[in-house]
Curated annotation (Swiss-Prot):
GO terms for biological process: coenzyme A biosynthetic process. This is Phosphopantetheine adenylyltransferase. It catalyses: (R)-4'-phosphopantetheine + ATP + H(+) = 3'-dephospho-CoA + diphosphate. The record marks 18 as: Transition state stabilizer. Its main location: cytoplasm. Pathway: Cofactor biosynthesis; coenzyme A biosynthesis; CoA from (R)-pantothenate: step 4/5. Belongs to the bacterial CoaD family. The lineage of its organism: Bacteria, Pseudomonadati, Pseudomonadota, Gammaproteobacteria, Enterobacterales. InterPro entries: Cyt_trans-like, PPAT, Rossmann-like_a/b/a_fold. It is found in: Cytoplasm. It comes from Pectobacterium atrosepticum (strain SCRI 1043 / ATCC BAA-672). Keywords: ATP-binding, Coenzyme A biosynthesis, Cytoplasm, Magnesium, Nucleotide-binding, Nucleotidyltransferase, Transferase.
Length: 159
C-alpha cells in the first residue's frame, strides 16, 4: 500500500524548520504533499502563488514531495488527494492543545485520516514564520532560518 501524506500550513514563508519536518516526512512516507493554505483570514505577506513558487524552489531536492496550494477544508483536500495521513509539527507544549483539537475535528470529519506528529530538530524548535518575519522587519539576520531564495524574497518584500 502506498502511503500519501499531507503536510499542511500557511508557510508564510517556508522556514528551515518546516523543511526539516518535510524532509523527515519524505523519508517516512511514499509521497508527501506540501499543502499551502490560502488562509484568507490571515494577513499573509506572500500571496498563495508566491508561497507555492518559493516552496517549489526550496523542495526541488525532494523527489517524492509535491507542492500544492489549496483553499478547501483540509479534510476535503485530503479526500481529493486520496491521502490518509496528515503530518503536523509540534514545537512546544503550547502547540499541543491546538493540534489536538485539529486532529480530533479532522478525525471526526474523516475517520480514515490519521494525524502524525513530528517534533522539529532542536535547532529549529523555537522558530516560526511569524518570528522570522518580525526579526527580518527589524533588520535582524534571518539567513540561518530560511532557504536562500526565501531570504531574498522576504527582504525584497519588506524593503
Amino acid at each position: 500500500m502506498t502511503t500519501k501524506a499531507i503536510y499542511p500550513g500557511t508557510f508564510d514563508p517556508l522556514t528551515n524548520g518546516h523543511l526539516d519536518l518535510l524532509t523527515r516526512a519524505a523519508r517516512l512516507f511514499d509521497h508527501v504533499v506540501l499543502a499551502i493554505a490560502a488562509s484568507p483570514s490571515k494577513n499573509t505577506l506572500f500571496t498563495l502563488d508566491e508561497r507555492v513558487a518559493l516552496a517549489n524552489d526550496a523542495t526541488q531536492h525532494l523527489s517524492n514531495v509535491e507542492v500544492i496550494g489549496f483553499s478547501d477544508l483540509m479534510v476535503h483536500f485530503a479526500q481529493q488527494q486520496k491521502a490518509n495521513i496528515l503530518v503536523r509539527g509540534l514545537r512546544a507544549v503550547a502547540d499541543f492543545e491546538y493540534e489536538l483539537q485539529l486532529a480530533k475535528m479532522n478525525h471526526h470529519l474523516m475517520p480514515t485520516l490519521e494525524s502524525v506528529f513530528l517534533m522539529p530538530s532542536e535547532e529549529w524548535s523555537f522558530i516560526s514564520s511569524s518570528l522570522v518575519k518580525e526579526v527580518a522587519r527589524h533588520g535582524g539576520d534571518v539567513t540561518h532560518f530560511l532557504p536562500d531564495a526565501i531570504v531574498r524574497a522576504l527582504l525584497e518584500k519588506l524593503h
